[in-house]
Amino acid sequence: MSKPSVLFVCVHNAGRSQMAAGFLSHLAGDAIEVRSAGSAPAETVNSAAVEAMAERGIDISAQSPKILTVDAVQDSDVVITMGCGDTCPIFPGKSYRDWVLDDPAGQGLEAVRPIRDEIERRVQALIAELTQIRQALTTATDSDPPDTNRTDDQRDRVEPGNAPARSAGYRFEHRG
C-alpha cells in the first residue's frame, strides 16, 4: 500500500501552507508524502513564518513558494486549502478540506505564533486521521480470505443468517 499524500494550498504559498507542510514533514517523517503550493505564489517564504517555525525546531528557510499545478492536485490524496477560495482546482475522488486560518502575510512574529499553533494542532489531528484510515485499510486487506470450502450454490443462496448485511436478509422486488 502506498503512503498517503497531502497537498497544502494557500494563496501565496509563503506562510500557512509552508508551516503546515513543515509540521507534517517533521511530525510524520516519511510516512506521508507532503506538498505545498499557492494559487499566486510570493517571491519568498514569509520571514515571520520561518522564525515561528524555527521556534519549534523546524527549518523552512530553504523552502520557496511554488505555483499550484493540476499535477500536484491529481497526485495528492488529500488537498487542504487555506484561503484560496475558487482558485483551487477540484477533482473527483480527492478529499478536500478548507482550513479557515488568519493570513500571516505582513504580520509580525507575535501575530504569527497563534496561527502556527493552530496549524500544528490541525496537522496533528490530520496525522491521527490518516493513520487510522491507513490501519483500517491495512487490516481490511490483511483479513482472512472468504470461506472457499462452500459451494457456489451455498454462497449464492440468500437465507436468514447468510444474507448480505445491506439487505438484512430481505428480498426486495420491484412492483410496478
What are these regions (language model features)?
Residues M1-D142, D147, D153-R155, A165-G176:
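Short polar/charged helix/loop
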